[in-house]
């Protein structure tokens, strides 16, 4: 709880607007208690964070992530239920990569979030840059427009590791990254990725822009 409050403080100092919150430990897929206990813990912790974020004018967006990264909040309807239990201004932050895994209909999930959607993370179904997989970006953006979403599309690609001769992007992995902290290295590894070369990262960023800019 204190860590997220510290993040809220940092975002405020950087003149940011919103903090996305995964209300569980990423990578932990075994429950700690009974469902009703864990729900109570989550609501209690989020309410404390929410009270602080409200006091400094920062929005919270509860983000559901896929079942292989957490057992707790995986779908948009779960995130909405938690947001409503926390407070009237608590929002949700959806992620196209996770939605592709967990939602029966990702477009309906977006529609259900109308009025509570405060952030949207974009990556393709393979977690590469938008346009490098099979997600329908034209329909995704159109659905966001339909519900009146006019906030940021946060590009959050996390390219999968491929250390085999079949790697379609040779020389994409940075074998000797400079200035990468142990925490950043662990974050990348926890997400099935690694440090990538500057050229590869630039290509992913360029592809994201080429895919999304014509739609917005």
Feature annotation, model-predicted:
Residues 9, 73-91, 100-216:
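Histidine-acidic metal/acid-base catalytic patches
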Residues 61-62, 93-96, 154:
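Generic enzyme active-site microenvironment
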């Amino acid at each position: 709880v204190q860590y997220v409050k510290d993040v809220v403080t940092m975002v405020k100092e950087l003149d940011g607007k919103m903090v996305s919150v995964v209300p569980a430990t990423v990578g932990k897929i075994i429950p700690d208690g009974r469902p009703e206990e864990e729900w109570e813990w989550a609501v209690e912790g989020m309410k404390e964070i929410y009270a602080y974020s409200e006091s400094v004018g920062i929005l919270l967006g509860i983000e559901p992530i896929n079942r292989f990264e957490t057992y707790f909040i995986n779908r948009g309807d779960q995130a909405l239920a938690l947001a409503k239990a926390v407070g009237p201004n608590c929002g949700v932050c959806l992620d196209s990569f996770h939605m592709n895994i967990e939602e029966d209909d990702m477009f309906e999930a977006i529609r259900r979030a109308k009025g509570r959607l405060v952030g949207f993370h974009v990556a393709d179904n393979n977690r590469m840059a938008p346009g490098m997989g099979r997600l329908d970006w034209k329909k995704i953006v159109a659905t966001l427009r339909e519900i009146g979403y006019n906030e940021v599309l946060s590009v959050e690609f996390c390219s999968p590791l491929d250390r085999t001769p079949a790697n379609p992007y040779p020389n994409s992995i940075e074998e000797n990254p400079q200035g990468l902290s142990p925490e950043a290295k662990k974050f990348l590894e926890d997400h099935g990725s690694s440090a990538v070369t500057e050229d590869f990262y630039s290509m992913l960023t360029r592809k994201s822009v080429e895919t999304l800019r014509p739609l917005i």
